[in-house]
């Protein structure tokens, strides 16, 4: 890409942005009507026309039902998509909207609807218009929330969701360059006022970016930091894979294992680096629990309790196991974690009784 953040994107640069998607059978473009997604649609259409045989493109707009202007904006997207020779669908988020956590709920609904649209269109990928500016904002949001290394890696260029690849081809492109591209092409776009609504966290942090940029922390620097953290996170994931294989290889033949249980020899587990131990617990709890992803802070607390119990003396664990009393037993995110007989075991926890339920007949 050009080093000039205010220069329009050339046809050659657009070809590079979409190059890895050339062999896909079909692509869904998520287009809201704002400048970023309108630029995505225009650039993708121009790229497709340059190919002898490119992927089929379908434009999808999600109307969350939160603003009166959204329906008009969806119609405008459809008009422009038609001019570009692309089919368009508008999908609506129906049902009650939550009073708290609205941005997260709207985002989840949007992705669910987009994945459904991709399956209907026979598309292998959904393309979103996240930019370098979005990446910087995401890093800041996760930083102030105290996220771990995985969270601070921010958004990946390619991720899989429900069997569909979510692609962000503009992740290294500044928003200003997309706006310059649209201005040169004389293409209009919508302005979503919620992007400036300081009732939400992202707009408040967005307002801080000019001050950070004055100190050298501009979107380019923050996005570069996210990329470096993502590189480190990928390395730790490989180390965690290796640690899991190591524990399996050194385990005894009669050790309890199965699709509904993860089991580690406690002494060997304790020798691993703390971050690796934490990730092994997170993986097991998220795989076997039935109450959604575990919170990082709670898993950190669990790991500290396990470390303390193991350090207190492995000699006590066999005696406790004989008496049927685990040294440690906790539930977290729908998983049951226990330390007994010198082993850490993780399995699905029994379903919680709902208030008013009674046992027996």
Curated annotation (Swiss-Prot):
The keyword Nucleotide-binding applies. Its EC number is 6.3.4.19. Keywords: ATP-binding, Cytoplasm, Ligase, Nucleotide-binding, tRNA processing. It comes from the Bacteria. It holds the Pfam family ATP_bind_3. Gene3D superfamilies: HUPs. One of its GO terms (cellular component) is cytoplasm. InterPro entries: Rossmann-like_a/b/a_fold, TilS/TtcA_N, tRNA_Ile_lys_synt, tRNA_Ile_lys_synt_N. ATP binds at residues 32-37. It is an enzyme of class 6 (ligase). GO terms for molecular function: ATP binding; tRNA(Ile)-lysidine synthase activity. CDD domains: TilS_N. GO terms for biological process: tRNA modification. It is found in: Cytoplasm. It catalyses: cytidine(34) in tRNA(Ile2) + L-lysine + ATP = lysidine(34) in tRNA(Ile2) + AMP + diphosphate + H(+). The N-terminal region contains the highly conserved SGGXDS motif, predicted to be a P-loop motif involved in ATP binding. Belongs to the tRNA(Ile)-lysidine synthase family. Ligates lysine onto the cytidine present at position 34 of the AUA codon-specific tRNA(Ile) that contains the anticodon CAU, in an ATP-dependent manner. Cytidine is converted to lysidine, thus changing the amino acid specificity of the tRNA from methionine to isoleucine. HAMAP family: tRNA_Ile_lys_synt. This is tRNA(Ile)-lysidine synthase. It comes from Bradyrhizobium diazoefficiens (strain JCM 10833 / BCRC 13528 / IAM 13628 / NBRC 14792 / USDA 110). The lineage of its organism: Bacteria, Pseudomonadati, Pseudomonadota, Alphaproteobacteria, Hyphomicrobiales.
